[in-house]
């Protein structure tokens, strides 16, 4: 029988050093340390109870749920987002440090679901408020689908370039009851422009001075003629 010859290991310094880039090192360090902020408003959020359990145990992926947006780099939105809750969601997203990511979980979060058909108070898609990285459809999505979405997000983080992480400063979007979005100032103060939320009617826009612009009294006969 022929003897198996093992190659001699090269123990030189050249093969003992791992070379990488700062960008890849930063991406690798964040792959297994995602700290999610769980934002649930409806029935899809109950699936997180299964994820926390021993069967799926999403702690093995390095996920550490946080209750403060300033300590989270991932927000999972699950359930219907209403007009009244939209300012709170935008403010939570703004308080998260960069780089930050968003997973939209469930049909109600992605498109508004069945509630957006005849409802004036439902936001038709959370991507109208904040940028979404991974869409997770379902009503509700299974825990396996949530894990798959997290895996896809980790692959996206691994391919990121540092320059792409610096997102352009886009204006914050405000909404009206007719689902029209306007660019407004920063919402860090928590005070939204009420004029955009509740636009004045056409009659209220006319100032009272227009009704009394005549210095001298005018008779009704002169106005008709």
From Swiss-Prot:
Question: Which compartment or compartments is the protein found in?
Answer: Plastid, Chloroplast thylakoid membrane
Alphabetically sorted, this entry's keywords are: 4Fe-4S, Chloroplast, Iron, Iron-sulfur, Membrane, Metal-binding, NAD, NADP, Plastid, Plastoquinone, Quinone, Thylakoid, Translocase, Transport
Could you tell me what the cofactor note in this record states?
Answer: Binds 1 [4Fe-4S] cluster.
Q: What class of enzyme is it?
A: translocase
- Asked whether the keyword Plastid is assigned, the reply is yes
Give residues annotated as binding [4Fe-4S] cluster: 43-44, 108, 139
One GO CC term, this protein: chloroplast thylakoid membrane
Q: Which cofactor does it need?
A: [4Fe-4S] cluster
Q: Which InterPro entries match?
A: NADH_UbQ_OxRdtase-like_20kDa (IPR006137), NADH_UQ_OxRdtase_20Kd_su (IPR006138)
Instruction: Give the superkingdom in one word.
Output: Eukaryota
Reaction catalyzed: a plastoquinone + NADH + (n+1) H(+)(in) = a plastoquinol + NAD(+) + n H(+)(out); a plastoquinone + NADPH + (n+1) H(+)(in) = a plastoquinol + NADP(+) + n H(+)(out)
Give the EC number(s) listed in the UniProt record.
7.1.1.-
BP-aspect Gene Ontology terms = aerobic respiration; electron transport coupled proton transport; photosynthesis, light reaction
Record's bilayer topology term: Peripheral membrane protein
Transmembrane feature ranges: none
Q: Which cysteines are joined by disulfide bonds?
A: none
Q: What does this protein do?
A: NDH shuttles electrons from NAD(P)H:plastoquinone, via FMN and iron-sulfur (Fe-S) centers, to quinones in the photosynthetic chain and possibly in a chloroplast respiratory chain. The immediate electron acceptor for the enzyme in this species is believed to be plastoquinone. Couples the redox reaction to proton translocation, and thus conserves the redox energy in a proton gradient.
Q: How does it assemble?
A: NDH is composed of at least 16 different subunits, 5 of which are encoded in the nucleus.
Annotated HAMAP family: NDH1_NuoB (MF_01356)
Instruction: Please report which protein family the annotation says this sequence is part of.
Output: Belongs to the complex I 20 kDa subunit family.
**Annotated protein name in UniProt:** NAD(P)H-quinone oxidoreductase subunit K, chloroplastic
Taxonomic lineage per UniProt? Eukaryota, Viridiplantae, Streptophyta, Embryophyta, Tracheophyta
Q: Gene of origin?
A: ndhK
């Amino acid at each position: 029988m022929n003897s198996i010859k093992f190659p001699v290991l090269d123990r030189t310094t050249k093969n003992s050093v791992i070379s990488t880039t700062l960008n890849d090192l930063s991406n690798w360090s964040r792959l297994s340390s995602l700290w999610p902020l769980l934002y649930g408003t409806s029935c899809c959020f109950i699936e997180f109870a299964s994820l926390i359990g021993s069967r799926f145990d999403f702690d093995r992926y390095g996920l550490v749920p946080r209750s403060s947006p300033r300590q989270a780099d991932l927000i999972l939105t699950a359930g219907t987002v209403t007009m009244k809750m939209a300012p709170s969601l935008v403010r939570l997203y703004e308080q998260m440090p960069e780089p930050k990511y968003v997973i939209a979980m469930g049909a109600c979060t992605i498109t508004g679901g069945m509630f957006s058909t005849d409802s004036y108070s439902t936001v038709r898609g959370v991507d109208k408020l904040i940028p979404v990285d991974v869409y997770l459809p379902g009503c509700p999505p299974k825990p396996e689908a949530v894990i798959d979405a997290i895996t896809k997000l980790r692959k996206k983080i691994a391919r990121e370039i540092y320059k792409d992480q610096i997102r352009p400063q886009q204006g914050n979007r405000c909404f009206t009851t007719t689902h029209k979005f306007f660019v407004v100032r920063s919402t860090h103060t928590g005070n939204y422009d009420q004029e955009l939320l509740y636009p004045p009617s056409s009659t209220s826009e006319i100032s009272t001075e227009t009704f009394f612009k005549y210095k001298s009294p005018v008779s009704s006969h002169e106005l008709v003629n």
